[in-house]
UniProtKB/Swiss-Prot annotation:
Residues 4-286 form the Protein kinase domain. ATP binds at residues 10-18, 33, 81-83, 86, 129-132, 145. This is Cyclin-dependent kinase 2. GO terms for biological process: cell division; G1/S transition of mitotic cell cycle; protein phosphorylation; regulation of G2/M transition of mitotic cell cycle; regulation of gene expression; signal transduction. The lineage of its organism: Eukaryota, Metazoa, Chordata, Craniata, Vertebrata. It comes from Carassius auratus. Keywords: ATP-binding, Cell cycle, Cell division, Kinase, Mitosis, Nucleotide-binding, Phosphoprotein, Serine/threonine-protein kinase, Transferase. Its EC number is 2.7.11.22. GO terms for cellular component: cyclin-dependent protein kinase holoenzyme complex; cytoplasm; nucleus. The gene is cdk2. CDD domains: STKc_CDK2_3.
Amino acid sequence: MESFQKVEKIGEGTYGVVYKAKNKVTGETVALKKIRLDTETEGVPSTAIREISLLKELNHPNIVKLHDVIHTENKLYLVFEFLHQDLKRFMDSSTVTGISLPLVKSYLFQLLQGLAFCHSHRVLHRDLKPQNLLINAQGEIKLADFGLARAFGVPVRTYTHEVVTLWYRAPEILLGCKYYSTAVDIWSLGCIFAEMITRKALFPGDSEIDQLFRIFRTLGTPDESIWPGVTSMPDYKPSFPKWARQDLSKVVPPLDEDGRDLLGQMLIYDPNKRISAKNALVHRFFRDVTMPVPPLRL
């Protein structure tokens, strides 16, 4: 750790404090994530170290690069490339004008490229949300915290006792499915796509049941005909209210037909039928994709 000079605290992630820091040797600015583990007494689990070390191999322009893993007695520091802003802050600052459609399209396309790459390496994210999508002034967007969920688990609360958001969580996870697939990340990205378009969260639930019911009220309560096996999931209840599906044109009115079609395929209940990142990249919505520069106020 001696080779890094902390510049300032830039945030509090799910697992610990994040600092902007400078590598004293190279002069490079990095993001230092200090991982707080409950196992303070036992030190860092070796499984976590192994998992995290594998992530150093994930090299892709739309994945935040993990430069190094620094392991001291019972602390773990992850050294990441530094980016100026996250998508949540950018959306919050763009509430008046919103994010332009070409920029939404570019961001979604880039995020799908990052997802397709990770999924092809059998790495899931499991906790995608606007806070861990990072942007720069060149128009790039990158996925942060990839693979951390598998190494450390997704806690119910952060180390500062903040509730970890459920807004982007796939229905199969909410219904108690223990074995899930890359499709959970596509669901999360679908929710983020809608939020970039409408400027408000698609399903802002405040508990697991509220989260499920918000999804059901919009997409209809799922049954065996549209999602085979749903009624035998651990947390499925036959007493769930039966809501009818709403038309997506009412849910995301600014979006054109191609955009609605893609969103609909990202939000399919049955994870086996949900579109993959690879197939989403060739959807006609992206036939005119460009890479505009965001109006960043850094």
